[in-house]
Curated annotation (Swiss-Prot):
Its main location: cytoplasm. Pfam families: CTP_transf_like. The gene is coaD. This is Phosphopantetheine adenylyltransferase. Homohexamer.
Length: 162
């Protein structure tokens, strides 16, 4: 069985993430979308809220599992018997950091592969940070995030959208 892990903070999941997830799910028997708990980041949404948004957004994909983990991604892959890390790229500027992380992961666990997927051009400008800022100021989120996530952002900031 070909198993891949798509790790991220998903604070919140965007349509850019969803694009990568949908395409990766077609390439693997099982795709684990895993929230990486990063003590260096202060997320807007709690871990449970982010898991809920992922579960709701991805509930119709039979080969996708939702999970969370702490520690090194490569250790999580070993625990899940996964062979591949999926990483999404919005622009060439994302590549340098992602490439260095892929090399580090390969050094730690030589059999781990990293596959980079370019997001569709229509999503290349979307980031979780930008989405949170748009939501905070009551801007229109249509086309940026799944509907359920838009609802949760509106609740969090108590702002109306478009």
């Amino acid at each position: 069985m070909r198993i891949a892990v798509y790790p991220g903070s998903f604070d919140p999941i965007t349509n850019g993430h969803l694009d990568i997830i949908e395409r990766a799910a077609e390439l693997f028997d099982r795709l684990i979308v895993a929230i990486a708990k990063n003590p260096m980041k202060k997320p807007l949404f709690t871990l449970e809220e982010r898991l809920d948004m992922l579960r709701e957004t991805l509930k119709y994909y039979p080969n996708i599992e939702i999970d969370s983990f702490e520690g090194l991604t490569v250790n999580y892959l070993k625990a899940k018997n996964a062979q591949v890390i999926i990483r999404g790229l919005r622009a060439i500027s994302d590549f340098e950091n992602e490439f260095m992380m892929a090399l580090t992961n390969k050094k730690l666990v030589p059999w781990v592969e990293t596959i980079f997927l370019m997001t569709k051009a229509e999503y290349s400008f979307i980031s979780s940070s930008a989405v949170k800022e748009v939501a905070m100021y009551g801007g229109c989120l249509k086309g940026l995030v799944p509907e359920y996530v838009e609802l949760k952002l509106r609740e969090k900031f108590q702002k109306e959208g478009c």
